[in-house]
């Protein structure tokens, strides 16, 4: 039987949102939700595997805007305030649903989830999740790659200087947070244009991630399609995403996030609860 290699490559990005002029800002919640629902759980899985002697060997892209937000003291404090309010709400929900076993089980699950997230964020990672990811990379458990400075769509940038700045600033930001130069880059939106490999080679990057059609409609077409890295003229390797696998974790129609057995996104205490009950947990604008 033929054997192959599987590369699990994750990409983490959020637009930069930081508004110190307001006590709270709705779009900052995107970061707080991602910390609780994605970044801390990822660290838990990676660290658990490493403790068991299993090196995950997962590649993880962390973009410069996300790295800056995760290491920002203001946003770190605001996340702690945010998750503390969620813990308080969950405690109230555990008491409110005491006579409804199914709902009570859900409330207890969320109470445990947010309590653990708060404890890990404050005590294990000292509010900076970057340190957790950096330690995993230094231990050889994962490899972290970079991205464009602002996640800008490179093919639509008309000036080579702008494209070069995106790549070079992405490299410098990576060095700032991870104390070494990156080997790879997730091209913003996986968007390729002819000649981008030369800019990547200038930055010392050895591989990049693109969408499948960049390879499948290339000239000449690689013999193995997207199922092997493609070496570009500048000597930088291109890895294409597998379409079917991507849909399983991304598509609302065929992937697991859109399946009600995974989660019911339209059931929300904000709609179910009385206004006076949920008011302390809403933004000040209601």
Regions found by a protein language model. Give the residues of each.
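Hydrophobic alpha-helical membrane-insertion signals
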Residues: 29-86
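N-terminal-proximal low-complexity accessory segments that begin disordered
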Residues: 3-44
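Hydrophobic, small-residue-rich alpha-helical packing segments that form membrane-like cores
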Residues: 190-206, 221-224, 235
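A structural motif corresponding to the C-terminal end of an alpha-helix
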Residues: 42-57, 126-142, 176-178
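Active-site cores of enzymes that catalyze phosphoryl transfer or operate on phosphate-rich substrates
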Residues: 2-5, 10-15, 86-158, 163, ...
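Short, solvent-exposed turn/loop segments enriched in Gly/Ser/Thr/Pro and often Arg
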Residues: 59-66, 148, 184-193
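Short catalytic/ligand-binding loop motif for oxyanion handling, primarily in non-cytosolic enzymes
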Residues: 15-18, 66-72, 152-156, 192-196, ...
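CE4/NodB-like, metal-dependent polysaccharide N-deacetylase domain
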Residues: 162-187
């Amino acid at each position: 039987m033929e054997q192959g290699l599987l590369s699990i490559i994750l990409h983490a990005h959020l637009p930069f949102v930081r508004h110190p002029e307001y006590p709270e800002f709705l779009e900052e919640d995107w970061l707080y939700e991602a910390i609780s629902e994605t970044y801390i759980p990822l660290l838990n899985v990676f660290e658990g595997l490493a403790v068991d002697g299993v090196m995950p060997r997962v590649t993880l892209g962390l973009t410069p805007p996300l790295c800056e937000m995760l290491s920002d003291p203001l946003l770190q404090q605001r996340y702690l305030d945010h998750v503390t309010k969620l813990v308080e709400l969950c405690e109230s929900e555990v008491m409110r649903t005491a006579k409804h076993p199914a709902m009570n089980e859900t409330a207890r699950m969320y109470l445990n989830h947010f309590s653990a997230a708060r404890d890990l964020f404050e005590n294990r990672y000292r509010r900076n999740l970057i340190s957790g990811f950096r330690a995993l990379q230094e231990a050889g458990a994962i490899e972290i790659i970079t991205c464009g400075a602002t996640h800008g769509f490179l093919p639509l940038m008309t000036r080579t200087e702008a494209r070069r700045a995106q790549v070079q600033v992405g490299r410098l930001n990576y060095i700032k947070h991870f104390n070494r130069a990156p080997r790879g880059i997730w091209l913003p939106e996986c968007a390729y244009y002819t000649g981008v490999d030369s800019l990547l080679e200038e930055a010392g990057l050895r591989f990049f991630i693109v969408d499948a059609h960049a390879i499948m409609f290339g000239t000449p077409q690689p013999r193995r399609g997207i199922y092997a890295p493609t070496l570009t003229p500048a000597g930088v390797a291109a890895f294409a995403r597998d379409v079917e696998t991507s849909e399983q974790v991304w598509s609302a129609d065929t992937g697991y996030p859109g399946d009600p057995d995974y989660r019911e996104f339209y059931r929300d205490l904000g709609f179910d609860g009385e206004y006076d009950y949920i008011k302390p947990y809403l933004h000040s604008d209601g």
